[in-house]
């Protein structure tokens, strides 16, 4: 038998088959979700600090003791990774000042013994100093320059409002000027009165002096009389004999009185001459 001829497929059917084949070749892209492992333990440095707080020894704690205590407290930590994590944590603690080596320790790196550093008390003054150190001096200068400008603007704006105050100030100045004038006039009057009183006192003194001089002038005349009396002294000395005569007369009277009878007064009293 002769071979059968291939039957030509319809054109529409070929297109559908081609579309099915193309769809099978398309790859479906699935989103790859990455699973993030959440750490069930705190960071290594905080774990080291916890261990050192519990074990406060003077000589400090060794690295091996720290590692064993971390594993006992946090069993989820991978012991293989903990070696490398401890080294980095200890170095960071030394750099930040959280950890300290004991005295007389010659160890270096993440070996030897470690202790916790004493917490430094930050005072208010220290905080203020830190704040002042962080501030830029240039910024302060700019703020100081800007502040006077604002003040000048405020003054210029307030000048029209201050006209009343200026008028009041002028009146006060005028009053203050008048008061000194009044005071000066009073002082001048007092000075004039004092001068008048001084002049009057001087005039009175002059009058008193003149009166004294007048009193002294006639007093000199009696001196002349005394001189005349002295000159006449010789004449009086010559007239002494009449005085003796007067004495003789008195003696005679006394003798006559003794010889005369005594007169009797009233009531038997004797009357004496």
Curated annotation (Swiss-Prot):
Highest taxon, organism lineage: Eukaryota
Renumbered residue ranges of the record's region 3 X 10 AA tandem repeats: 189-217
Residue ranges, compositional bias (Basic and acidic residues): 154-256
GO biological process: nucleosome assembly
GO molecular function, one term: DNA binding
Keywords, comma-separated and alphabetical: Chromosome, Developmental protein, DNA-binding, Nucleus, Repeat
InterPro entries: Histone_H1/H5_H15, WH-like_DNA-bd_sf, WH_DNA-bd_sf
GO terms for cellular component: nucleosome; nucleus
Subcellular localization, as worded in the UniProt entry: Nucleus; Chromosome
Main localization (coarse): nucleus
Sequence repeats: 189-198, 199-208, 209-217
Domain H15, chain residue ranges per copy: 40-118
Record field: compositional bias (Basic residues): 264-273
Positions of region (Disordered): 1-24, 120-273
A Pfam family that the UniProt record links to this protein: Linker_histone
Family: Belongs to the histone H1/H5 family.
Assembly behavior: Interacts with nap1l1.
Listed name of the protein: Protein B4
Organism of derivation: Xenopus laevis (African clawed frog)
